Regions:
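Exposed, interaction-prone extracellular/peripheral surfaces
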Residues: 1-128
Length: 128
């Protein structure tokens, strides 16, 4: 569903721009950044690191990533985050949240350990 969007910008591109903005903000704060690519399963994990070179690698991966599935399971991604990231972090969950299973319980558990900020990207035309 991320390929849907207006003729000006797809949701995928919008998510990539948001992620890039957050990544460059992380550089300014000397923070680590990593990415979990997911569909209805974990497709790729880039562990958190610092540095401009790492951020550029992440952005390149964001631009080139093609999910194997067109389904979404946010709960799976949140559970994975909780299992692989041991130290408390701020995690931005970027998704359109369409076709998701109920992910409230995994999100509640993740929020006990991390500060999870959900960012929903949508296109008004989907609702029309």
């Amino acid at each position: 569903s991320l390929e849907f969007g207006s003729h000006v910008q797809t949701k995928r591109r919008m998510l990539t721009e948001i992620a890039a903005t957050l990544a460059f903000s992380a550089i300014q704060n000397n923070d680590k950044i990593g990415v979990i690519f997911f569909s209805d399963r974990i497709e790729k994990f880039i562990p958190p690191k610092k540095g401009r070179k790492h951020i550029l690698y992440i952005i390149r991966e964001l631009l080139e990533f093609k999910p194997e599935s067109n389904r979404t399971d946010v709960g799976c991604a949140v559970e994975y985050l909780t299992s692989v990231i041991k130290r408390r972090c701020t995690a931005f969950l970027l998704s359109d949240f369409i076709d998701d299973k109920d992910f409230r319980q995994p999100l509640t558990i993740a929020n006990r350990k991390h500060d999870v900020v959900a960012v929903q990207v949508y296109d008004r035309r989907v609702a029309e």
